[in-house]
């Protein structure tokens, strides 16, 4: 089957493809050759072929990269290099948090159901990832999206109620850890002794032991004392617990609105289901899952830092004394790595060459700490992303813990003005082959 067509709709493309697959009974296979048109929207091709309508850029890039590895059954797919390049460029340009994409996906699901979808419906019917709605700066919550775009939605909340919904939506609804979601649920259900009840519920229902290191960061998030910098003011009034670790009187008053309470609980259940689906298989004694994706803020939170760190202050890596942890963030750029030896780069799937921040000495506390981690028990965690210019998916793959090997040495940086210390890390877990290939390849 040869297809020559513009790329306008993932759904129409699949329907066209389905017609071509009606092979005769005597034929064992069919080959489809697709000549891609309309380069602006050819990101719809991996969406159509993968059936992944979440509009997650990195997931689409990986599908184009890995193709047949991710296809179910006996089907195979191959993209030539020019097609890969064009599709990657289209994915990079696309704005998947765009209101039109969100509205079109919402309307398609609404027409399918014959009613306003609830949060769980988006996952149940493989529609757009609701996180795209939460991450859209115009909305921030499903309630606000419906208020602006659904004429049949008549529910009104106060600005403060909306802030609570937006805070949970943006910070916890992805389900990357159960603790905060469960704590907020307990604030609604019991209103007293929240942390004590949280410890009991975690152990009894999830077999998770509440660690002492969890205590401060979770309380700080519930009291709006975790955020720093300009972000601190955004949700400063959405307070969940008071100084006695009971539900804050302000929230108790707002919960008198039964519809608000219902939406809070629905949002929390959505996050808990995401957690159960994606994040229960934590690595070693951490709250992180190998090969899952995390933002800078996610990492600070899940490593149990007392307060968040502004990304600009992290600068590639940052040490937290209270938890004795140091996350290392690598932006892997194939073209840049081809051009300069003084850039972070992989030697193989378990070995990484890294550089310190400028003008450090080998004798500095920072470098000595890294090389003495066997004695000081420093935990060094690696996070890698492929394209730092992606404004939608600002997330890194978690690759596990690593250890410094060989001797560090001083190098002069390409600008000839600054020096740095070069050192080598060995990962505890070799990076999964298909993920490693995806990260290091150009297309």
Which sequence ranges carry the predicted segments?
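Compact mixed alphabeta submodule
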Residues: 389-443
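Long, largely alpha-helical accessory region at the distal end of helicase-like NTP-driven motors
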Residues: 49-185, 198
């Amino acid at each position: 089957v040869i297809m020559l067509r513009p790329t306008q709709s993932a759904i129409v493309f699949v329907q066209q493809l389905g017609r071509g697959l009606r092979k005769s009974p005597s034929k064992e296979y069919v080959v489809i050759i697709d000549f891609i048109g309309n380069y602006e929207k050819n990101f719809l091709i991996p969406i159509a072929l993968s059936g992944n309508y979440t509009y997650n850029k990195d997931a689409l890039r990986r599908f184009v990269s890995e193709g047949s590895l991710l296809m179910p059954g006996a089907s195979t797919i191959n993209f030539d290099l020019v097609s890969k390049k064009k599709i990657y460029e289209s994915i990079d340009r696309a704005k998947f948090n765009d209101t039109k994409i969100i509205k079109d996906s919402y309307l398609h699901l609404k027409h399918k159901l014959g009613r306003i979808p609830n949060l769980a419906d988006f996952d149940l019917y493989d529609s757009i990832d609701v996180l795209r709605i939460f991450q859209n700066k115009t909305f921030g919550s499903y309630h606000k999206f419906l208020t602006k775009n659904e004429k049949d939605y008549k529910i009104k909340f106060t600005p403060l109620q909306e802030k609570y919904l937006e805070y949970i939506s943006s910070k916890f609804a992805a389900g990357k850890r159960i603790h905060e979601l469960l704590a907020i649920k307990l604030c609604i259900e019991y209103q007293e002794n929240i942390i004590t009840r949280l410890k009991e519920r975690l152990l009894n229902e999830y077999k998770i032991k509440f660690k002492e290191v969890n205590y401060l960061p979770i309380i700080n998030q519930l009291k709006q004392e975790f955020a720093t910098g300009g972000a601190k003011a955004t949700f400063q009034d959405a307070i969940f617990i008071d100084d006695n670790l009971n539900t804050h009187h302000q929230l108790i008053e707002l919960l008198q609105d039964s519809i608000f309470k219902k939406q809070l609980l629905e949002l929390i259940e959505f996050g808990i289901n995401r957690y159960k689906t994606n994040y229960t298989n934590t690595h070693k004694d951490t709250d992180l899952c190998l090969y899952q994706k995390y933002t800078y803020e996610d990492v600070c939170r899940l490593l149990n830092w007392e307060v968040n760190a502004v990304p600009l202050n992290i600068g590639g890596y940052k040490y937290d004394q209270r938890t004795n942890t140091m996350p290392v963030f690598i932006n892997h750029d194939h073209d840049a790595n081809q051009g300069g030896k003084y850039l972070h780069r992989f030697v193989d799937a378990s070995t990484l060459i890294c550089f310190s921040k400028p003008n450090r000495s080998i004798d500095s506390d920072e470098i000595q700490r890294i090389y003495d981690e066997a004695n000081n028990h420093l935990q060094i965690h690696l996070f890698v992303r492929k394209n730092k210019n992606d404004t939608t998916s600002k997330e890194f793959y978690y690759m596990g813990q690593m250890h410094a090997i060989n001797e560090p040495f001083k190098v002069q940086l390409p600008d000839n003005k600054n020096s740095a210390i070069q050192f080598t890390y060995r990962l505890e877990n070799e990076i999964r082959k298909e993920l490693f290939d995806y990260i290091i390849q150009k297309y």
